[in-house]
């Protein structure tokens, strides 16, 4: 194998696939990154057997070939190089990769590429290599920037507790004209739905995707060409899902990335049953102001289980003008009281929330104003952007019960 590429492009590709490298594994090859030079592209690949990522970058290939090298060493070395051309050559007999960039030279011991697990691909139509597995299934196209926003607004609500694997996933439902995502950790629920430009499925398809997989996809999409859709493939057995993303032109960019993920084999809870059907108090407040007030309150709430009391009250005479007051108390640090003007309909109410949960959802709302709907201090509250219906974006958060 003899191949050349730009340092910026290789660094970008390694940063993308590197997050899929197995942190701890009994298989040494899973701690490596695969480099495969072919068709004037350099494919980088990594997997932990749950998530697999392929990334293709532009390259000049003189001799085709492949090798796997330690991920951490390769990434740190490439990031230390100047932004110039990198020449790589493989000594097949010793499985050693020689790298040269400007006046920097290195030799890295690797493992045979044939030992590396095969990562499924969406395919380009000309695959003849027996080492390539083209994933078959239902193909769906999604608008790139809209998909990233959906992921950001939902995946944070998933659980990180591996003892509850079902809640570590995001339920993704493909309908003929609609895409819906939902995630919950048992204390909060985030549901986001969007219209599809054209139907890709005749019957609904619902799968449970690990939140970590969607999080990685969101990071990849941040550098993607938003003019091209993300292609999604769901296998007929509903055990794998693949996302294909196209990159931008220029230095420090990739040609395309494919993320393949195992699906969670479990039934997601019926979250619709916990969504409040009515409310007694409706509060409309400036999103940025509320987010800032919660962050200030959290400074005092950190020593008290992050509890922030939220009191809403309508204006004099029952008019819509009113206020929202946030209170946080620490036995050792003191207390904080923050007041904001708000449009309040209904009765006075005080309810306590986890400040972190409020910050998480408010940070993902772009709209200028947000709606908080509540019934009583012991019942869940709902948060959504003003102007978006409950069938578009809805966040439900359970109240806390601070000691009196």
Predicted features and spans:
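Structural preference for solvent-exposed beta-strand-turn elements
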Residues: 1-404
